[in-house]
Amino acid sequence: MAQFDLTRINCQYLDRHLTFPLLEFLCGKEIYNQQELLEYILETVNKTNMIDYTMDTRKRLNLSQEMPEELVQRKAEVLATLKQLQNEVAPIMKATDILKNGESMKDSKTFVNALQKDYNFKVEHLESAYKLAKYLYECGNYQESTSYLYFCLIVMSPNDKNYLNVLWGKLAAEILTLNWNTALEDLTRLRDYIDSANFSTIQALQQRTWLIHWSVLVFFNHPKGRDLIIEMFLYKPLYLNAIQTMCPHIMRYLATAVVINRTRRNALKDLIKVIQQESYTYRDPITEFLECLYVNFDFEGARLKLHECQTVILNDFFIVACLNEFVEDARLMIFETFCRIHQCITISMLADKLNMKPNEAECWIVNLIRNARLNAKIDSKLGHVVMGTQPLSPYQQLVEKIDSLSMRSEHLAGLIERKSKQKNQESIDSWKYY
């Protein structure tokens, strides 16, 4: 279903190395021409120093079984440059080992003092460590690259010209080595830096747009990610504004997170508002499923869209692992919404709405009532499900109010900050005439 594939647009906001898992994932699907896809991978990998990956891709394209002279020469150059950079960093190699093993060295001042005292540390060493980290990353040696990037983060001043690049590089390397806990820490650190940095409005918007795309990789792989993606994308006005302005297609991932997160059903109301606002710029089966169900109360439409959702998710690298969960929770949403409207429902009617056989639907409803403690009874003889009232718990009411107040407070804080910056700028401009 190339119509709803977001790989092309997502790759525009990802580092070159982060696109490879997405492209390799597509190779296992039948969405695009395999030859053209492999040619694009080869074109992309040629811009890196991953010679072995380049050779492997050439073999898959049946170009050659032997390494061309050009690649042999490039590999020799890469190894020579790598050795040269490692020699430049040699004086602080032991220091990076201490940093990896010693928790006490995580304090920046302590570590820098130890470097200067014990290793005769100089500014040139920091520049060499940065260059080596970047080069290792370009070679695909992400694990080793993280050690030097971490070293740079500890030693560098946030005002250093390379500090922002190190933050982005560290996050990318942790994602590519599947270190999700560390990746989340790096994501938070980078977000805090972007939010507090003195960027222009356009620069800040661009930085947040890139961060939004990178963060999707982290959020759908971290245990706490399903809550964090909702908080960041839906309840942080600066990031919601970036989504609405630059990348409304991210609504797919926000909507998916809300559907599979049963503890955050309170976010549905706010999500539906945003989906309706952005429906003229972006729609897909996932957002349309929620519109059918919660705006139009079109259960037949929701049933058809749920079927389309399965195909979309199956072909989306970011959320493919959520497929079974999404289908289960989407059925639950249909069931809950249908039950709010009808007090007495036939099992055959529910089975039709849920794309299930009557026997399967009855077992599913029995388990649902037992596990979710829904106030309902099943009359097997008549084939009816009789619903009781399901009041909103005080906890859910409290969470809804807190989220609403938090969003309003952050919006007001952003408004005050923008007015303050504008006032300061006017004051600075007025001095130009004296």
From Swiss-Prot:
Chief location: cytoplasm
Protein biosynthesis recorded as keyword: yes
Residue intervals of the PCI domain: 219-392
InterPro entries for this protein: eIF3e (IPR016650), eIF3e_N (IPR019010), PCI_dom (IPR000717), WH_DNA-bd_sf (IPR036390)
Origin: domain of life: Eukaryota
Molecular functions (GO terms): translation initiation factor activity
Subcellular location per the Swiss-Prot or TrEMBL entry: Cytoplasm
Protein function: Component of the eukaryotic translation initiation factor 3 (eIF-3) complex, which is involved in protein synthesis of a specialized repertoire of mRNAs and, together with other initiation factors, stimulates binding of mRNA and methionyl-tRNAi to the 40S ribosome. The eIF-3 complex specifically targets and initiates translation of a subset of mRNAs involved in cell proliferation.
Protein name, as recorded: Eukaryotic translation initiation factor 3 subunit E
